[in-house]
Structures are given as C-alpha cells and as structure tokens.
C-alpha cells in the first residue's frame, strides 16, 4: 500500500496534523443526517495515461471495489459502506454518495491510502501499470516480491522531486539492513 502514495491519490487526504482535507475533491457538502455527501472534484486532474479524472471514473472505481469483494490485505471495501449508492454527474463535476445510515466520518474513510482512485478501464494490467493520478507511474514491474520501477507521471499537476523511484521488496531483515548500509 505504500506504493499507492506515489501512484494513486484519494478524494481526501490527512494533512500533517492528521486532519482530513479535500485532495482530488475541491469541496463537499453533507446533509444534516450525514447520509448524503456531494463531492465536487477539482478541475484539470488527469490520470497518468492522460485521461481526465471524472466523477464517472471515481464511481467506476467504487463499483469495482464492490464487485471484487473483500480480498487481499488492504480490503478497501471496508472504507465505503457496501450498500452505499454512488451517482456521478460529469457535467456538474460532482459525485454523490448516499449511505443507508449516518456516516459522519466518510471523508476520513475516503482519505485512507487504500482508497486511492484507480482508473479501472483496464483491470487486466493492474500489476504492470496501475493508472492513477499520483506523481509517479509504474514503468517496470520486476516481479512478485521484487518490486517496481516508477517514473514521474508526465500528467501530474505539480513538479515531482525525482524522475525515477525504485521500490524494492525485501522480506529478510538482514537483507534490508545490508541494503541500507550499502
């Protein structure tokens, strides 16, 4: 999941004081019962493949999570009520989430790193090229348990600190120590 920080981003994020703030979202409103959330997306956000981030893309990702069901170690499905209804309005640039019960902390739930938005148009190639809006994108998948080579996302809206990042997985504590010392 640490990889998600560089490849994907969420509608919300935790700031340095651990307060939730909009990230891919520009703003949001919530009804008094905390059962209907209308989230307005920021304009001009692009996925690493150049496609625009739209409310429909976000809705498709949430639907994909429901379809996949709880699996893997991250289980992003647990951060959005399974029965929630998600409606996308691309013209208004809004996403409406209706829950069956009050959900006072929905922005906090959507700020969790596993809720980074992914373009699910091509789910066959997730390992080799997850499409996100983050500062980096996958250049090379080096194999399970080996890692990834990341490159700067040319469609990112800000400068990134590095042109390339190598993520290496090391299960052995001694190997980690030796790698850090070299």
Name what the model sees in each region.
Residues 29, 40, 74-119:
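Surface-exposed binding/hinge segments that line
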Residues 16-17, 33-34, 42-44, 58, ...:
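Solvent-exposed coil/turn segments that connect beta secondary-structure elements
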Residues 12, 16, 46, 63-70, ...:
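Sec-exported extracytoplasmic/periplasmic mature domains
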Residues 36-39, 58-61, 95-97, 134-139, ...:
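Short, well-ordered beta-strand elements
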Residues 108-160, 164-166, 175:
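Gly/Pro-rich hinge or "lid" segments in bacterial periplasmic/extracellular proteins
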Residues 6, 15, 19, 23, ...:
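Extracytoplasmic/secreted proteins, especially bacterial periplasmic and envelope-associated proteins
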Residues 1-30, 131-132:
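N-terminal lobe/hinge region of extracytoplasmic solute-binding protein
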Residues 26-71, 179:
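Aromatic- and charge-enriched surface segment that lines or borders ligand/interaction sites
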């Amino acid at each position: 999941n640490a990889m998600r920080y560089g490849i994907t981003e969420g509608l919300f994020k935790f700031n340095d004081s651990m307060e939730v703030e909009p990230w891919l979202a520009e703003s949001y409103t919530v009804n008094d019962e905390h059962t209907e959330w209308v989230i307005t997306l920021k304009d001009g956000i692009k996925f690493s493949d150049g496609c625009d981030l739209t409310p429909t893309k976000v809705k498709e990702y949430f639907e994909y999570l429901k379809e996949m069901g709880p699996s893997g170690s991250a289980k992003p499905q647990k951060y959005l009520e399974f029965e929630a209804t998600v409606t996308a309005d691309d013209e208004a640039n809004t996403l409406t989430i209706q829950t069956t019960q009050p959900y006072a902390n929905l922005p906090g739930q959507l700020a969790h790193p596993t809720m980074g938005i992914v373009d699910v148009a091509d789910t066959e190639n997730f390992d080799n090229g997850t499409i996100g809006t983050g500062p980096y994108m996958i250049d090379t998948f080096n194999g399970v348990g080996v890692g990834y080579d990341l490159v700067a996302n040319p469609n990112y809206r800000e400068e990134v600190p590095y042109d390339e990042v190598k993520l290496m997985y090391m299960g052995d504590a001694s190997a980690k120590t030796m790698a850090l010392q070299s």
